[in-house]
């Protein structure tokens, strides 16, 4: 097989990159608050997964979906949770 494979070809016109970036931007406030050790771990893993494995934010979010969902529920961040769940239903 020559060339690169675009696993997101079925996501054409879904705006998945922007939607993933928006969720990550909202998660940044939790990372910055550092109220839970997971957030520092998540921030570091995001960097590692992007740099070493070439994973995009949608894949990083998918990898940590259950934990993110639980923490967002616990923190009462229902707007970010809704955005994350929309990504899950439509793109993951």
From Swiss-Prot:
It comes from the Bacteria. It holds the Pfam family CowN. InterPro entries: CowN. Keywords: Nitrogen fixation. GO terms for biological process: nitrogen fixation. Is required to sustain N(2)-dependent growth in the presence of low levels of carbon monoxide (CO). Probably acts by protecting the N(2) fixation ability of the nitrogenase complex, which is inactivated in the presence of CO. HAMAP family: CowN. Belongs to the CowN family. This is N(2)-fixation sustaining protein CowN. The gene is cowN.
């Amino acid at each position: 097989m020559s060339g690169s494979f675009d696993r997101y070809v079925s996501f054409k016109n879904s705006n998945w990159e922007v939607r993933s970036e928006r969720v990550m931007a909202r998660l940044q406030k939790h990372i910055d608050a550092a109220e839970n050790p997971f957030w520092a771990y998540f921030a570091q893993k995001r960097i590692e997964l992007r740099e070493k494995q070439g994973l995009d934010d949608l894949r990083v979010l998918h990898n940590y979906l259950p934990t993110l969902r639980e923490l967002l529920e616990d923190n009462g961040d229902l707007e970010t949770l809704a955005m994350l769940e929309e990504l899950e239903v439509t793109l993951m």
